Amino acid sequence: MENAENSTRCPWCGADPLYQAYHDHEWGRPVRDPRRLFELLILESFQAGLSWITILRKRDGFRAAFQGFDPASIATWGEPEVARLLQDPGIVRHRGKIEGAIRGAQAFLRIEARDGFSPFLWSFTGGEPLINHPRALADVPAQTAQSKAMSGALKREGFNFVGPTITYAFMQAAGMVNDHLATCDWRS
């Protein structure tokens, strides 16, 4: 899309430039890199109960606090790191979510060694993006059979804050599902 200023977008991103840039350049674009998928999944887990724009505004803080979302590093963290993060105003300071990110990093390492994290996650869509054709926001589901299956599998592996609504939002963010509205100039 050349002229983003005059484009038609999905209405959920509103007029906020940060939200529009996220919509235009990230949301719905397939991500296969395991570390980037880990970052997206952890950020989505922190979003539980909050708005996504809150997480976007703190994303740089999260990246700094979580050492670029390096799973090998995060997996070794204990109470000192949790205490440090609970004092960091650049992130969402929620003990359960921080501890969940540490357990998620440990689970990531197990999955990556066994199956590969990216193939594991993409297996819930058959390895290819699911292309939906919503005409309005009301046509976009909050969860699907695939997000329920992914949620259950991630929980069994040790992830937290990954219910089926969070995993569906993750699938949208990672381009596993294309839910750009039919009228959105950024659909393709």
Regions found by a protein language model. Give the residues of each.
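HhH-family (HhH-GPD) DNA N-glycosylase catalytic core used in base-excision repair
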Residues: 1-188
